[in-house]
Amino acid sequence: LLARPTTKEAPQLANLLIVIAYVAVMLGIGYGCMRRSGTVSGFFLAGRNLGPWMSAFAYGTTYFSAVLFVGYAGRLGWGFGMHALWIAAGNVLFGSLLAWWIFARRTRRMTARLDALTMPQFLAARYQSPFLRLAAALVIFVFLVPYTASVYQGLSLLFQSNLGVSYEQAIVFMALLTGVYLIMGGYLALAFTDFLRGLVELVGVVVMVAFLVHLKGGFTAATTALTDPHAAPALLPPLPGKPAPMFPGWVTLLSLVFITSFGPWGLPQMVQKFYSIKSEDDIRRAMIVASLFSVFIAFGAYYTGALTHLFYGADVKSFLTAKYHLPAGKDPLDYLMPDFLTTKVPAVVSMTILLLVFSASMSSLSSLVLVSASAIAIDLYAGARADANSRSVVALMRVMCGAFIAISLYIALNKIDFIVNLMALSWGAIAGSFLAPYCYGLFWPRATKAGAIAGMLSGLLTMLWFVETHKAPGNPAVPVASALAMLVPVVVVPVVSLFTKPPDAAHIKNVFG
């Protein structure tokens, strides 16, 4: 037991100590926030009292999860080369800058006026429809599961290389840690830890990109090499792959830009950040910070994914399949970034990247779990029981946080694959359900209850129809269907609203002030 660690064990022990220190800080934050999370508003929105930096980092770390670094960056960086940076540009401009500029102030003002804490509460109050509250809560709870499970993916090789632990041990550890500090401190603990994790992610991205381009002669040399036609896959013909793709590459790329950039406009876990900011005066600063954070994270991740073309040959799929003994049907590109980040960099850089991916995973998992728990505790339980007190709702929310983490862990342990398509599936279903009713509800007084219900159902049914007819999530055309699920309600809501009875004038005056 007291023997000197071997050469391989010594760095793993040092890395383990770093992770333990990191975990201790997370738990300390959770414990410190317990006293301020006793009310429903305190637990779920930190009392609507977060400053601009905390709000911006909470938004950014929720937006860019481990799915980006492990799934999107690898698969899309390999599939599109430098063209994948168009996705990063869309994420920065539309997903961050315009999201804060257009929606934050109006959302903060209107939800406070309606006393709405959640997306289902807002839709029900804005459209005077209890049905929307129930339907929205069910959509959130059901369709956040695939995305939550996908957050765990890709951690295995990074943990095995740096800490010598298995995939199962890694994700159980992450789930337990997330559950403990989230159950203790709620959204306030999440915001504090997101700020810390955001700093870790920024440092990790800079170190990762700097080292990798150094291996290829610097940023200019690496970028020049990536602009070579052989390193930038064509977008006009269909992308190679099985099953045969249904759309040209540029259509798939455009769909990915759309769903990852405009999808956050209707995702409850993203919109929540607008509810909780302290004042409207803080929104401009939060917008700037969130946008700058997105520049570093999005461009760093997709640029790193494109760099894989300079380190691997065209036979990368066969290489990864053989190296990791992958069974038939398992996409080897899900292993591209983990292999890349554990075999091409020294131990200290790999450990930095591990903390980056670990931080991104916990940030997204926390936000998803909290929003899902609110759907049950606030929207279903408190919505059905007029006598429900704040203490019982908070207690149920804590229980549901634990339950939802357990469900997502079960799915992840049963090897749910296709990281990118899982994310696209959940984003398509949720954003397709909420994007149009939410946006029209904020800005168009003429939007009606019937229009909102029709819009929600049309988006959801579009996505479900595609899943059934095209056997998603394995089909690579899922991003195209997700984009359609978001676009269809944009047309349906105004058309149905114009042909149905206008909302009550007094109610609209109260809603819009």
Model-flagged regions — what are they?
Residues 31-32, 67-76, 82-83, 144-158, ...:
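Transmembrane helix-loop junctions in multi-pass membrane proteins
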Residues 1-7, 375, 470-513:
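Terminal cytosolic tails of multi-pass membrane transporters
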